[in-house]
Amino acid sequence: CKMSTKEEILSTYRRNINVKEQYDMPDLDALKGVEYSDPVAQFIAMSKAVGGDVVTLERGADVNEAIRKAYPEAKVFTSNVPGITIAQRNPDTVGSAQELNGTDVGIVQGEIGVAENGCVWVPQTMKERAVCFISEYLVILLSRNSIVSNMHQAYSRVRMTSYGYGCFISGPSKTADIAQALVMGAQAARGVTVILTD
C-alpha cells in the first residue's frame, strides 16, 4: 500500500519534531495593564470613540423610559432582563433564534466594562444569544461599579454561565473592505448604547 502525499507529509513532520526540553513560561508580571484614575470617564470616552453611546441612568430613573428615549422609533424590543417591561419578545421563550429576526432593540445585561477599549463582557444568560447580534440596535445595561481599567482585570473577573458562552462587545459591528471603507452594522448591531446604572 503506497502512502498518500498527506500521510508522507505527516510522517516526515512527526519524525522531525523533537521536543527535548520544556521551556518555562515567561514572567508576565512585568506586563501591567494601564490604570485610569477615573475608569468610568475613560470607558465613556472610549465607547464613544468606537462608535457606541453611553447613557448614565440617574438614581430612581426608569430604565424603560431611558431606552424608549434613546430609540423613539423602535417598535420591537427583546429582552429577558428583569425589570424590562417594554420587551414584547423574550429570548428565553421563543421557539428558535429566527423568531428574533426583526428585533429593533435587544436589551441585555453586561457584567464587566473595560475602560481601555470601551468593551463590555456580556455572558450568555438567555436561551437564544442571537439577540446580541440579530437586533438592529443593542442596549447593554452595566453597573458603573463593574467598570475596570484594563483587559487583564476584566479577564480575571470573567465567569462563565451554564451556557458556556459570552463575548466582549465594543460599540456597533464594524467591518472594512480592501478600500478601507468602514461600514458600521454590517454583521451585527448598527448601534450600541450602554446604560450605566448604580
Short names for language-model regions:
Residues 2-198:
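The feature marks the mature, well-folded catalytic cores of soluble enzymes
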